[in-house]
A protein has these predicted regions:
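Structural motif
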Residues: 36-50, 138-145
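Hydrophobic beta-strand segments
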Residues: 51-55, 82, 150-161
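A glycine-anchored, Pro-Gly-centered beta-turn/N-cap motif
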Residues: 68, 76-79, 101, 151-154, ...
């Protein structure tokens, strides 16, 4: 029978390797800090496009794909001012104390403006719960704006019965007038600002009043913008 031979030197090396594998990460984690958290739009809770976050000379990528989470590693413990900047948002800064290990700091970015906003185009769709409105922002090139923050906006409108033929028509009686509640659709590409006029607000003669003209004004921090839809359907599709 062969006897197994145990080499003390090998055992010592193995023990040292195991200890180093366990202790080094703990030592590094204790010496350096990691700052992580969520960075979102203050109103919508969506990820912020092209945000850059800086702590103690460490920064995220300037043009990273928009996600809510971020992290910065290898930061020596101490006092810092965390700064975050993004196009069309107000700058964010917060004094933080970084300790060894993980430090959670959430960032809420307040929208400043819609870039190069020149006009709006509004589309309507008659749904089960009412007339839904989709607001699209247009820039100086006549293109739809896709990257913009959520802002505090107000929408007002007047809905008129449409009288006449498809080619020749005028405004009839006033059906609805006043504020229209807006909501945010995170999944939309262009029209993330939407609104709904519930059928309960629309009192009409369903036999004779089929179409309407809707005059809209959107109040924004950059001024008022108007649009008219002249073929609003007054019935559910």
């Amino acid at each position: 029978m062969k006897k197994s031979i145990v080499y003390p030197g090998i055992i010592i090396v193995v023990v040292i390797v195991v200890l180093l594998a366990v202790l080094i990460p703990r030592w590094i984690g204790g010496k350096y800090g990691e700052v992580r958290g969520e960075a979102v739009d203050a109103l919508s809770g969506d990820p912020v496009w092209k945000i850059r976050i800086v702590v103690g000379g460490k920064s995220t990528l300037k043009y990273r794909y928009p996600t809510k989470t971020y992290y910065l590693t290898g930061i020596e413990p101490g006092s810092y001012t965390l700064k975050a900047v993004a196009p069309n948002y107000y700058d964010f800064s917060k004094d933080i104390q970084v300790k060894g290990g993980q430090n959670i700091v959430d960032i809420s970015m307040k929208g400043k403006e819609i870039p190069d906003l020149q006009s709006i185009i509004v589309f309507s769709e008659s749904l089960e719960n009412g007339i839904q409105l989709e607001i699209r922002f247009v820039n100086s090139k006549g293109e739809g704006i896709t990257e913009f923050p959520a802002l505090s906006l107000e929408l007002e409108g007047t809905l008129w019965a449409r009288i006449g033929t498809e080619e020749d028509y005028v405004k009839g009686r006033k059906i609805v007038e006043g504020p229209i509640e807006l909501f945010w659709d995170s999944g939309a590409f262009l029209a993330r600002n939407k609104a709904i006029i519930p059928w309960e607000r629309i009192k009409i003669d369903r036999e004779t009043e089929k179409l309407a003209i809707l005059e809209l004004t959107l109040h924004t921090p950059q001024g008022d913008f108007s649009d008219i839809i002249d073929d609003v359907q007054l019935y559910k599709e």
